[in-house]
Design a protein with these regions (language model features):
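Surface-exposed, charged secondary-structure patches
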Residues: 2-75, 124-142
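Short beta-strand edge/turn micro-motifs at domain boundaries
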Residues: 51-62, 75-128
Length: 142
């Protein structure tokens, strides 16, 4: 199912160079990126899967097929996401242009997928910290 998501990401990615400049060993490219809003897609998938898993009687369902169908539906009805991104390049020791990368560039290319992923992992981390603190307080009180 992840392959399906990343294929849709690649298929729907459009990058239009708006402006570029070169100054010695540095270059800047301003681009307009259009892709699907993967942060929204992932949020919708998570919400819909939670409902499916929590619905009584769904335990016998082939959840992989349900998951795949939800992904197809979300991709089919996804909103576009547009962003203006600046790519900075520098020449390496061999004279080849290399991307001076940062996470924001990758997130723009991925339609917000990385930001969604990081937020979910951060929330999970805080949820675990809260749970551990509550367990510690309960143990201390007993």
């Amino acid at each position: 199912n992840n392959v399906k998501l990343f294929k849709a990401m690649a298929k729907n990615l459009k990058c239009e160079i708006v402006e570029s400049s070169e100054n010695g060993n540095e270059a800047t490219v301003k681009a307009h990126i259009t892709t699907l809003d993967f942060a929204k897609i992932m949020s919708n998938i998570s919400s819909r899967l939670m409902v499916e898993y929590m619905t009584p009687g769904n335990s016998g369902k082939d959840m992989d097929k349900v998951f795949s169908g939800i992904i197809d539906d979300e991709i089919k009805h996804a909103d576009k996401k547009e962003s203006d991104t600046v790519f900075n390049f520098v020449k390496d020791k061999k004279g080849n242009w290399t991307l001076d990368s940062n996470v924001a560039i990758y997130d723009d290319i991925c339609g917000g997928y990385l930001q969604y992923y990081f937020q979910q992992n951060t929330l999970g981390k805080y949820a675990n910290e809260i749970k551990e603190k509550q367990q510690s307080e309960t143990t201390t009180q007993n």
